Amino acid sequence: MGKFDGVLIASDFDNTMVYTEGALRSGGPVPAISRENRDAIEYFMAQGGTFSVATGRALPSFASVMDGVPMNGPTVLFNGAAIYDFPAGRYLRTAFLPECIRDHVRQLSQLMPGLTYEIYHDDNSISIELHIIVENGVNLPAVCRSIMNE
C-alpha cells in the first residue's frame, strides 16, 4: 500500500499548475510544467495517489498543452461539464448544454444588448463578437466568444 492510496488531487491548469498568463496574452507557447511540480506529482502518483487536472478549457485546447503533465486520473474539462479519459480517448461523463441554447442566448442578446457571454463548443469552434466590458469604471474592449453565428 502506498502512502496516498485512495487520495485524489485535481489541480487547475492555467496559472495554478503552469503559469500561462503571459503566453495567453502574447499568443506565445504555453510553458512546460516546472520540474518541482512534475516531481511532486510523480512522487504522489508513485505512492498510490490519483492525480488529475480540472480546467475550464475545452478538449482541443487542453489536449494541445497537456504534453508533459503527469496524470493517472481522468481530466475535468469545460469548467466541470465533462470528464475525459485521455488514454481511452473518450468522455466518461458530459453535461453539455442542449443545442437550443443558441436560440435562448440569441433571445437574451436581443433583450439585453450589453450581455457578454462565452460559450465553448465541444470541437472548440467559436465565432467572435466584440463587446464592451466595464471594469472598475473603465470601458475595456473585450472579445466575447460564442457559437451563435454557426
What positions do the PLM features span?
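Glycine-rich phosphate-binding loop signature in dinucleotide/nucleotide-binding domains
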Residues: G2-K3, L111
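Active-site phosphate-binding/coordination module
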Residues: S34-V138
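Solvent-exposed alpha-helices and their adjacent loops that cap or buttress functional pockets
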Residues: M1-G2, V69
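A short, polar/charged loop-to-alpha-helix boundary motif
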Residues: R25-E36
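Asp-based phosphoryl-transfer active-site loop
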Residues: D5-G27, V53
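Residue-level recognition of short loop/turn positions
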Residues: M1, D14, P87-A88
